[in-house]
């Protein structure tokens, strides 16, 4: 199922638990043998984001913001939350079962109860027409959102027991990051040590480490590699997956603990990809929604998510904001 484009290393190992910003949420181990490798989504859905928790994948529609939940064991799914009419892009689930959703051109973010589909909170980050709230990552005490049209991050500070804030904060980006025309800050992840944030700038293909206290950015040294069309990011241990949407591939990098330097170790693709936008992990697989940006959307256009083999040996603990099992990468997926 998975075609290897380039193999630069055969062993990627996962270090000790991330510290600092990292969430303490843990997901139960879940074998995926026999589960479907293609998840069919509603016709015309136009997926963009994905989050996984407790064997369920949540997909957001960039068309109307609906949230569609899929049982990873069976592939059966249903809409659990009606959208606001604007897109639902990047998403993450916290340990309380709350889905944090980036609101695209709406300039907002929502928090949804995955059990009931009820919107628990909605935040207006900006009233500017020049906005595209693109992705979100959860740390221990905050949710962080990117805006591809504004040189800022939006922060929702979480209180005791995950209490949601009354209003968001805006953190201007400075340092090496230079805002350009087109899509800018897109995917976001934590650094391996949990002390910083990582963003990918789609227009340049650069990765940046962000100081969460100040917004000061420093370009991550990844040698001559460029993350062209970089979209969603997924960090597991010191392994960073960068989904390169229009290139139909995923770059796999090994980072140092502080997230200031990395090495491209391989690139992978699948014949089932059709502009994948981001990735979430469960068991021994990565799941990627296919946005099909190059296909004109109609009410009958087919959409799906692709599951690719990511690992050979899930191990006991879980990382990455409660969404995936802690994993040792023994060899490239075949």
Q: Where on the chain are the PLM-derived regions?
A:
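Secretory targeting and sorting signals
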Residues: 1-29
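Beta-rich, blade/repeat-based domains predominating
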Residues: 42-56, 83-99, 126-144, 175-196, ...
């Amino acid at each position: 199922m998975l075609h290897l484009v380039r193999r630069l290393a055969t062993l990627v190992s996962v270090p000790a638990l991330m510290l600092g910003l990292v969430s303490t949420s843990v997901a139960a181990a879940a074998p995926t043998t026999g589960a479907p490798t293609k998840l069919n989504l509603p016709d015309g859905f136009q997926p963009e984001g994905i989050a996984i928790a407790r064997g369920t994948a949540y997909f957001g529609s960039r068309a109307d913001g609906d949230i569609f939940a899929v049982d990873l064991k069976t592939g059966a799914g249903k809409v659990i939350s009606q959208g606001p009419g604007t897109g639902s892009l990047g998403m993450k689930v916290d340990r309380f079962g709350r889905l944090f959703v980036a609101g695209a051109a709406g300039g907002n973010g929502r928090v949804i109860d995955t059990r009931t589909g009820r919107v628990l909170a909605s935040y207006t980050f900006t009233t500017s027409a020049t906005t595209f709230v693109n992705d979100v990552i959860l740390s221990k005490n905050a949710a962080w959102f990117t805006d591809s049209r504004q040189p800022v991050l939006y922060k929702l500070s979480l209180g005791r027991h995950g209490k949601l804030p009354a209003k968001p904060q805006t953190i201007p980006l400075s340092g090496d990051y230079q805002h350009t025309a087109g899509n800018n800050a897109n995917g976001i992840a934590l650094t391996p040590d949990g002390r910083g944030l990582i963003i990918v700038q789609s227009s340049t293909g650069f990765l940046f480490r962000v100081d969460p206290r100040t917004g000061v950015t420093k370009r991550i040294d990844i040698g001559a590699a460029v993350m062209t069309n970089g979209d969603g990011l997924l960090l597991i241990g010191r392994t960073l997956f960068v989904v390169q949407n229009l290139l139909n591939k995923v770059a796999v990098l090994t980072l140092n603990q502080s997230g200031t330097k990395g090495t491209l170790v391989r690139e992978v693709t699948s014949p089932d990809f059709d502009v994948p936008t981001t990735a979430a992990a469960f068991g021994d697989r990565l799941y990627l929604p296919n946005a099909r940006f190059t296909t004109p959307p109609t009410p009958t256009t087919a959409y799906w998510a692709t599951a690719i083999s990511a690992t050979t040996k899930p191990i006991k603990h879980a990382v990455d904001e409660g969404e995936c099992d802690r994993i040792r990468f023994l060899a490239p997926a075949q």
